Curated annotation (Swiss-Prot):
Forms homomers and heteromers with SUN3. Interacts with SUN1, SUN2 and TIK. GO terms for cellular component: endoplasmic reticulum; endoplasmic reticulum membrane; nuclear envelope; nuclear membrane. The chain crosses the membrane at residues 28-48, 545-565, 576-596. It comes from Arabidopsis thaliana (Mouse-ear cress). Residues 58-98, 139-158, 366-410 are annotated as: Disordered. Residues 179-343 form the SUN domain. This is SUN domain-containing protein 4. Its main location: nucleus. Keywords: Coiled coil, Endoplasmic reticulum, Membrane, Nucleus, Transmembrane, Transmembrane helix. It comes from the Eukaryota. It is found in: Nucleus membrane; Endoplasmic reticulum membrane.
Length: 596
């Protein structure tokens, strides 16, 4: 019983300690939550105060920077530039960095395409010709560098000769001139996009309902989506701030190079737009939208301009509303305007800039001609005639003088220039016949450039003809060397065949020697067998001789004994003694022969 009570007491103490620890943890966590909430509230108040100061300063700058009505035509561009710089808001650092990195390759490609469109067609044609010609020597130099080196001095000398022959000096100079003229023509055009203007002097809004723009789709919760393309402060696009995926798709009046957009919210009892995203496309409906930029608007009830870092050609825009200021129930948007340049305006701007360039060239040519006339008046008539001949030759030879000459002839004819006539009207648009006249003048300039190209190509053909002749001579020398190498290779092949034949003969001789050696070994074995037989016979003969010798010795001893003892007994019988004597003599004779 006592043990059970002690266990219950211990359990109660443990449960009390755990509950006390939990209560302390909850108290600490609640205090931290309240502290963090207070810090967040103070930071939001400070941010809203800073945004309000920025909005006031921006409003003051806009009110001070409004131009007068009398100077609208002269100062409209400067005021728009200052207003764009003052009211344009940069995107968030994280989003902008990602967007800039993602659009770096596309911006480079679009800039190169715009440069090629703005450059004169004559320069483009010449540039293509020069680039196609430059590729040949570069490929030749690469092939020469990849060849197997023999002697260092010979290879370096041949490479230098080939480079000097393949790259004439005139080609590089012409290419540098073309690139310089291209840079000069692009210096005033690529820096910025000049917006299309209306006849009244205002910027042309491609997202206006009066121009034909439409709102194609929006999210289900949105109401009054078509109000943002009508400039009416009492109408607006309304969305509950709690909804996600708020968007609006707008069809522009024309296919446009969009450069700037303007948004505004004039409704006081609503939350202002903060972060938004702009997408574009040329075809609708589509699954792939081109990202144009992410922006952050100020918390203010005024119009705000946003300029794209990389303008692109689009027909449909999609506005994604990402976040908002404040804590109102509705998020509204009163205005959306789009500014840029359409394809026709872009082409006319290029033509006007090219025409200005030609006028400057004509003025420079006139000044040079006046200076030359004053210098010629001081000199004698004979020198004047000689110099005039030389100048005519130089003008016929140089392509730039030919172009200036043709332009001066066009000026003397005093053809009407539709570009100059309509350039003084900034808000007007050229009719179709004036565009055709401009295109005809463009075709004439292209004809002049083609004649220049023909003369240049003739000179290049002569130079390259000489180079090709030298290359033919070198090729003939190389062919002779190749023929000698072929003969040497054939001799080497014959020698190889002879060595193969000798090797075959050596193999046959070796086979013969091997067969003879085999025969000799067989005979040797036979001789060994015969010698063994002879040795065996000799051994047998020796044994036989020993046996005969022993027998003869035995019979000899018997005969001696018989003769010695029988002489006294058998004296009377003479015939018996003679037989033993003969036996003794024959045995001694045999022993003597065997002893030899």
């Amino acid at each position: 019983m006592q043990r059970s009570r002690r266990a219950l007491l211990v359990r109660r103490r443990v449960s009390e300690t755990t509950s006390n620890g939990r209560n302390r943890f909850y108290k600490v966590s609640l205090s931290l939550v309240f502290l963090i909430w207070g810090l967040v509230f103070l930071s939001t108040l400070w941010i809203s105060h800073v945004d309000g100061d920025k909005g006031r300063s921006l409003v003051d700058s806009v009110e001070k920077g409004e131009p007068d009505d009398e100077r609208a035509d002269e100062t409209a561009e400067s005021v728009d530039a200052t207003s764009l710089e003052s009211t344009s808001v940069h995107s968030n650092p994280g989003l902008s960095s990602d967007v800039d990195i993602a659009a770096a390759g596309e911006s480079k490609g679009s800039e190169t395409i715009l440069k090629q469109l703005e450059v004169d067609n004559t320069i483009v044609i010449v540039g293509n010709v020069t680039e196609s010609k430059d590729n040949v020597p570069m490929k030749q130099s690469e092939i020469n560098n990849n060849t197997v080196p023999g002697n260092d001095t010979e290879t370096t000398g041949s490479k230098l000769d080939q480079l000097s022959r393949a790259v004439p000096l005139g080609l590089d100079e012409f290419k540098s001139r073309a690139s310089n003229s291209r840079d000069k023509s692009l210096s005033g055009q690529v820096t910025g996009v000049i917006h299309r203007m209306e006849p009244g002097g205002k910027e042309y809004n491609y997202a206006a309902a009066s121009k034909g723009a439409k709102v194609l789709s929006s999210n289900k919760e949105a109401k009054g989506a078509s109000s943002i393309i009508c400039r009416d402060k009492d109408k607006y696009l309304r969305n509950p701030c709690s909804t996600e995926g708020k968007f609006v798709v707008i069809e522009l009046s024309e296919e446009t190079l969009v450069n700037t957009i303007k948004i505004a919210n004039f409704e006081h009892y609503s939350s202002n737009l903060k972060d938004f995203e702009i997408l574009g496309t040329l075809v609708y409906p589509t699954d792939t939208w081109v990202h144009l930029g992410n922006f952050t608007a100020l918390n203010m009830k005024h119009e705000q301009n946003f300029t794209f870092a990389d303008p692109k050609w689009v027909r449909y825009l999609k506005l994604n509303l990402l976040s908002h200021y404040g804590s109102e129930f509705y998020c509204t948007l009163s205005l959306l305007e789009v500014y840029g340049v359409d394809a026709v305006e872009r082409m006319l701007e290029d033509l006007i800039s090219i025409q200005d360039k030609n006028i400057l060239k004509l003025q420079e040519g006139d000044t040079e001609q006046k200076e030359k006339k004053t210098m010629q008046a001081k000199e004698s008539f004979e020198s004047d005639e000689d110099k005039s001949k030389q100048k005519e030759k130089e003008q016929e030879a140089s392509p730039e003088n030919a172009v200036v000459k043709d332009e001066v002839s066009l000026e003397k004819r005093k053809l009407p220039d539709p570009v100059e006539e309509i350039k003084h009207q900034p808000g007007s648009r050229m009719p179709g016949d004036t565009v055709l006249k401009i295109l005809m003048q463009k075709i004439r300039s292209l004809d002049v450039s083609l004649s220049v190209l023909e003369s240049y190509l003739e000179e290049r053909s002569l130079k390259y003809g000489m180079i090709f002749k030298e290359m033919d001579l070198e090729a003939s020398k190389r062919e002779k060397e190749v023929e000698t190498m072929r003969l040497e290779v054939e001799g080497m092949k014959e020698r190889e065949e002879n060595t193969k034949k000798e090797a075959m003969e050596m193999r046959k001789w070796r086979m013969r020697v091997e067969t003879e050696l085999e025969k000799a070994e067989n005979e040797k074995e036979k001789v060994k067998e015969r010698l063994e037989q002879v040795l065996e016979r000799l051994e047998w003969m020796e044994k036989k001789g020993v046996v005969v010798f022993t027998i003869c010795v035995g019979f000899g001893t018997i005969a001696v004994v018989a003769v010695v003892f029988g002489m006294g007994i058998v004296r009377a019988e003479k015939q018996g003694g003679l037989a033993w004597l003969l036996l003794l003599i024959s045995s001694t004779f045999v022993m003597f022969i065997l002893s030899l």
